[in-house]
């Protein structure tokens, strides 16, 4: 019987085992089938048939059974090992994308081993407090992570029916965000920035100060025990990486942070897997360890440019500005890995940072990102030039999930009305400022002068704050009311009369 079973496995067919009818043997057939099925894969074959190298791609010929997305190990003539992934299969040809770059690859002497498996990353709770390179290898002189599991870096698709709508507001301590663009736990909201603006400082401040405004209680929860940060850097300079690392160390949160660093001098192609490694780690921490994970991805512009480089090397038809036509889909595979899942306490909140080339919000990268994500935080150069920190322009900023994360029982019942009125007054103030530049201050009405006064005080008192100033959402709303008292009650048309009568009087700040 044993010999027949062995012959069955060798001949490529699972052995015929008797179906167990009960007792401890239940599942023996399934187990035997699973074991034999795993070892029925093709043997690992090594090839020395590199027919060409093009940019980050290696083209192999005479390959037996190549599979899409299969991992390939390359051994260079000097013994250096690199890894890649099959991007394209055509008959016996295979196009392999090499993560560490193709410099030094000798077409005649490089051997390529096909593993028959997809790209998996080892994950463990011990990854917190560690620093990895863009390929997931430790670079902090610590030991290799003892994996609790090996997960596919593309992630597991979440059943839309099992997603929970984000309803718990995260208090960031930044008035422009908490008061007017509130972030919910499980949301994906990017920071639209540009070269030279303090987007890193804003992201670090959010990491330092983020806490939960508890539902049904006006109490801020600063409990840190189940909070984790996963930080992925793509194509950033050493200064940015050091800034984040030292900031996490200084505020004592490094033990709850996992860093993936692909620096500017690292291979471009590696940037394509760095965010996926980070998100796979975040999914493990959120859904297996039930932690609330904040994922920061910087800089998504570098990621998109790496995507364009691979696309150009494959000679695909380019889309807008040379970016591939599938960039929207590709970005969605990253951004849509945020959220909450029914039956699990953990959550993933994503804050991708992208630098808009030439400050252009119509550029394909911010344009497509804005379609996928639930709003954006817009960092403005004009505010930055006037020494206002954080230079967040609230007019183009947006949080699509704000409406469900604020209000009575979550923040305060006047939150939505105050936010709407501040938006309206600031927008009118901007119009008046533009008109003043044309007609002069003498031609303005008394109402116009009130809007101008509001504009200046709003930018100086509400938007501007210190990098270590942590305002509660209630302090933010009280500052908002102080500014709205510049106007007589009759001009505050966005706020219901009942809310006005409760909060407009001077002593209402005690609420």
Curated annotation (Swiss-Prot):
Q: Name one Pfam family in it.
A: ATP-synt_VA_C
Its membrane topology is listed as:
Peripheral membrane protein
The UniProt entry, under Gene3D superfamilies, shows: 3.40.50.12240
Q: What are the protein's UniProt keywords? A: ATP-binding, Cell membrane, Cytoplasm, Cytoplasmic vesicle, Deafness, Disease variant, Hydrogen ion transport, Ion transport, Membrane, Nucleotide-binding, Synapse, Transport
Q: Which InterPro entries match?
A: ATP-synt_VA_C (IPR055190), ATPase_a/bsu_AS (IPR020003), ATPase_F1/V1/A1_a/bsu_N (IPR004100), ATPase_F1/V1/A1_a/bsu_nucl-bd (IPR000194), ATPase_V1-cplx_bsu (IPR005723), P-loop_NTPase (IPR027417), V-ATPase_su_B/beta (IPR022879)
Gene Ontology CC: apical plasma membrane; clathrin-coated vesicle membrane; cytosol; extracellular exosome; extrinsic component of synaptic vesicle membrane; intracellular membrane-bounded organelle; lysosomal membrane; melanosome
Q: Which GO terms describe its molecular function?
A: ATP binding; proton transmembrane transporter activity; proton-transporting ATPase activity, rotational mechanism
GO biological process entries: ATP metabolic process; proton transmembrane transport; regulation of macroautophagy; synaptic vesicle lumen acidification; vacuolar acidification
Keyword DNA damage in annotation: no
Residues reported to bind ATP:
400
Give the UniProt family note.
Belongs to the ATPase alpha/beta chains family.
Concerning NCBIfam families, the annotation shows:
PRK04196.1 (NF003235), V-ATPase_V1_B (TIGR01040)
Q: Quote the disease note of the record.
A: Zimmermann-Laband syndrome 2: A form of Zimmermann-Laband syndrome, a rare developmental disorder characterized by facial dysmorphism with bulbous nose and thick floppy ears, gingival enlargement, hypoplasia or aplasia of terminal phalanges and nails, hypertrichosis, joint hyperextensibility, and hepatosplenomegaly. Some patients manifest intellectual disability with or without epilepsy. ZLS2 inheritance is autosomal dominant.
Q: How does it assemble?
A: V-ATPase is a heteromultimeric enzyme made up of two complexes: the ATP-hydrolytic V1 complex and the proton translocation V0 complex. The V1 complex consists of three catalytic AB heterodimers that form a heterohexamer, three peripheral stalks each consisting of EG heterodimers, one central rotor including subunits D and F, and the regulatory subunits C and H. The proton translocation complex V0 consists of the proton transport subunit a, a ring of proteolipid subunits c9c'', rotary subunit d, subunits e and f, and the accessory subunits ATP6AP1/Ac45 and ATP6AP2/PRR.
**What name is this protein filed under?**
V-type proton ATPase subunit B, brain isoform
Give me the gene this protein comes from: ATP6V1B2
């Amino acid at each position: 019987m044993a010999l027949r079973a062995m012959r069955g496995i060798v001949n490529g067919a699972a052995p015929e085992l008797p179906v167990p009818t009960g007792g401890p043997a239940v599942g023996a057939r399934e187990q035997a089938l699973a074991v034999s099925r795993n070892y029925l894969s093709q043997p690992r074959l090594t090839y020395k048939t590199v027919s060409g190298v093009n940019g980050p791609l290696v083209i192999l010929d005479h390959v037996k059974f190549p599979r899409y997305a299969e991992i390939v190990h390359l051994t260079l003539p000097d013994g250096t090992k690199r890894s890649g992934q099959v991007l394209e299969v055509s008959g016996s040809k295979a196009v392999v994308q090499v993560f560490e770059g193709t410099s030094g690859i000798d077409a005649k002497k490089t051997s390529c081993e096909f593993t028959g498996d997809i790209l998996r990353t080892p994950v463990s709770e011990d990854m917190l407090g560690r620093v990895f390179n863009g390929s997931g290898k430790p670079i902090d002189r610590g030991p290799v992570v003892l994996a609790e599991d090996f997960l596919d870096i593309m992630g597991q698709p979440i059943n839309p029916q099992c997603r929970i709508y984000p309803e718990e507001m995260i208090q960031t301590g930044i008035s422009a965000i908490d008061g007017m663009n509130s972030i919910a736990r499980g949301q994906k909201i990017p920071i639209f920035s540009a070269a030279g603006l303090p987007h890193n400082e804003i992201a670090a401040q959010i990491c330092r100060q983020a806490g939960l405004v508890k539902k049904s209680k006006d109490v801020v929860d600063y409990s840190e025990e189940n909070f984790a940060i996963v930080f992925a850097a793509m194509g950033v300079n050493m200064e940015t990486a050091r800034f984040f690392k030292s900031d996490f160390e200084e505020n004592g949160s490094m033990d709850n942070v996992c860093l993936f660093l692909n620096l500017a001098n690292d291979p471009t192609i590696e940037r394509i897997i760095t965010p996926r490694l980070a998100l796979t780690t975040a999914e493990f921490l959120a859904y297996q360890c039930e932690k609330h994970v904040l994922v920061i991805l910087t800089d998504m512009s570098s990621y998109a440019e790496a995507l364009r480089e691979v696309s150009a090397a494959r000679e695909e038809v380019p889309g807008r500005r040379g970016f591939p036509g599938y960039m929207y889909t590709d970005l969605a595979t990253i951004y849509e890995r945020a959220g909450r899942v029914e039956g699990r306490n953990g959550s993933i909140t994503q804050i991708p940072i992208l630098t808009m080339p030439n400050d252009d919000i119509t550029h394909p990268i911010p344009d497509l990102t804005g379609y996928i994500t639930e709003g954006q935080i817009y960092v403005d150069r004009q505010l930055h030039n006037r020494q206002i920190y954080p230079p967040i322009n609230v007019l183009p900023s947006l949080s699509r999930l704000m409406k469900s994360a604020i209000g009575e029982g979550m923040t305060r019942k006047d939150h939505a009305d105050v936010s709407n009125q501040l938006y309206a007054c600031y927008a009118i103030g901007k119009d008046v400022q533009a008109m003043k530049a044309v007609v002069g201050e003498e031609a303005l009405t008394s109402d116009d002068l009130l809007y101008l006064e509001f504009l200046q005080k709003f930018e100086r008192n509400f938007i501007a704050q210190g990098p270590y100033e942590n305002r509660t959402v209630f302090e933010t709303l009280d500052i908002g009311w102080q500014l709205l008292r510049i106007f007589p009650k009759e001009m505050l048309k966005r706020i219901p009369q009942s809310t006005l009568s409760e909060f407009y009087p001077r002593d209402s700040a005690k609420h």
